[in-house]
């Protein structure tokens, strides 16, 4: 039994809870959060602490999930490794390459597992696409394109979530999903990135949209398009299915609205976090629409899984919605801790994705292509 704790019980941290509780390999032993209300909510089912440092004093704890603000990740992950814990670190991994490297070095010194996620590259349809690439029946991947349109900018946010210097804005927080997907499908080793980012609303200033072009070392190319301004409804590209696999009601009007006060927004975010990421769904998750083009066919997501288009016609692959992406994350963590197989989403994989996010922002700032130096391929094949 792997005894695990969670630091930070916002939407991301809460989404870990059901995935841990249904996995027989794990025991949710503790949580850490500065909110007295959240600690009271979990009291009786787990030990509660006001902060990660207090939780790390539990010598029986084997691992921690860190879902705190991004600017805290480096110090907290290093402290967890120093305390002898395995670490699951929410994306984005850090706010700088230097901090990400510090985290990796700390994990290697401690000899402990570092897993970075959840990322939508864990999604079962994306993993199945990668398996098609590995099987080789469609030939080499040549293009991967992913598009996502949401109201991300206008959802309740902490101030740092909109501050790019602190890992905020859609390129860090949502591009980390998209670029992870592109890397997994195209072999991981991006050579360069060219991007344009946008701030459409000065009253809610942040990087709220982007177009990113990635050139891969193996000859493939990928694009990521994201807008968080609540114009085009999410479900228009996803057969009416939302990010987590539930039917997405068509909005009667734009969700864009003026932000509330900081305190009101914090309260709204805390309330939304309780149900923002459901555990089970009738369909596989959709992070927008992703289409993979190989030499002998194109693959796209469908409500049931994948459609494979070739010269011979269209075939379908059913993908189970039984297990959530976070269920799959904890399988990967369990296997890594128990020595069954190394994790794909380890520190060096996450560093490469972070480099792409930072490179996209820098490319937009200076108006030219950015060469990449920290890229890597997946360490193994996907497990379906």
Over which residues does each language-model region extend?
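Predominantly a Rossmann-like dinucleotide-binding segment in NAD(P)-dependent oxidoreductases
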Residues: 113, 120-224, 229-245, 367
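NAD(P)-dinucleotide binding in Rossmann-like oxidoreductases
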Residues: 202-207, 217-329
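Short, Asp-centered acidic motifs that coordinate Mg2+ and/or phosphate
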Residues: 30, 63, 143
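Short glycine/proline- and charge-enriched loop/turn segments
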Residues: 84, 158-166, 311-315
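N-terminal Rossmann-like dinucleotide-binding module
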Residues: 1-43
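C-terminal helix-rich "cap/oligomerization" subdomain common to oxidoreductases
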Residues: 63-65, 267, 272-276, 281-283, ...
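Beta-loop-alpha module in the N-terminal Rossmann-like domain of NAD(P)-dependent dehydrogenases
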Residues: 16, 46-106, 384
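Aromatic/hydrophobic pocket-lining residues that form π-stacking "cages" and hydrophobic walls in ligand
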Residues: 39, 76, 103, 129, ...
């Amino acid at each position: 039994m792997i005894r695990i704790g969670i630091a930070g019980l916002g939407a991301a941290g809460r989404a870990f809870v059901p995935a841990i509780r249904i996995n027989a390999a794990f025991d949710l032993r503790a949580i850490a959060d500065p909110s007295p209300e959240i600690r009271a909510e979990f009291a009786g089912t787990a030990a509660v602490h006001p902060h990660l440092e207090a939780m790390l004093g539990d010598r029986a704890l084997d691992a921690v999930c860190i879902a705190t603000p991004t600017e805290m990740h480096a110090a907290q992950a290093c402290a967890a490794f120093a305390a002898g814990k395995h670490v699951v670190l929410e994306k984005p991994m850090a706010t700088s390459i230097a901090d990400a490297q510090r985290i990796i070095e700390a994990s290697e010194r401690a000899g402990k597992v570092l897993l970075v996620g959840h990322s939508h590259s864990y999604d079962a349809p994306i993993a199945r696409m990668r398996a098609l690439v590995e099987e080789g029946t469609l030939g080499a991947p040549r293009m991967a394109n992913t598009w996502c349109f949401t109201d991300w900018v206008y959802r309740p946010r902490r101030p740092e979530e909109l501050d790019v210097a602190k890992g905020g804005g859609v390129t860090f927080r949502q591009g980390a999903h998209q670029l992870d997907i592109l890397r997994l499908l195209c072999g991981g080793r991006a050579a360069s990135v060219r991007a344009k980012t946008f701030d459409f609303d000065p009253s809610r200033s942040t990087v709220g949209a982007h177009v990113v072009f990635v050139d891969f070392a193996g000859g493939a190319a990928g694009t990521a398009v994201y807008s968080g301004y609540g114009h085009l409804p999410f479900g228009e590209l996803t057969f009416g299915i939302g990010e987590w696999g539930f039917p997405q009601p068509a909005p009667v009007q734009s969700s864009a609205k003026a932000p509330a006060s900081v305190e009101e927004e914090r309260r709204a975010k805390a309330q939304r976090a309780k149900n923002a990421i459901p555990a089970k769904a009738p369909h596989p998750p959709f992070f927008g629409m992703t289409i993979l083009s190989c030499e002998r066919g194109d693959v796209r997501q469908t409500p049931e899984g994948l459609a494979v288009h070739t010269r011979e016609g269209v075939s379908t692959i059913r993908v189970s919605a039984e297990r959530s992406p976070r269920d799959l994350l904890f399988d990967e963590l369990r296997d890594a801790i128990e020595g069954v197989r190394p994790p794909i989403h380890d520190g060096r994989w996450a560093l490469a994705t972070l480099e792409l996010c930072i490179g996209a922002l820098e490319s937009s700032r200076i108006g030219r292509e950015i060469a990449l130096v920290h890229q890597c391929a997946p360490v193994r094949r996907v497990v379906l």
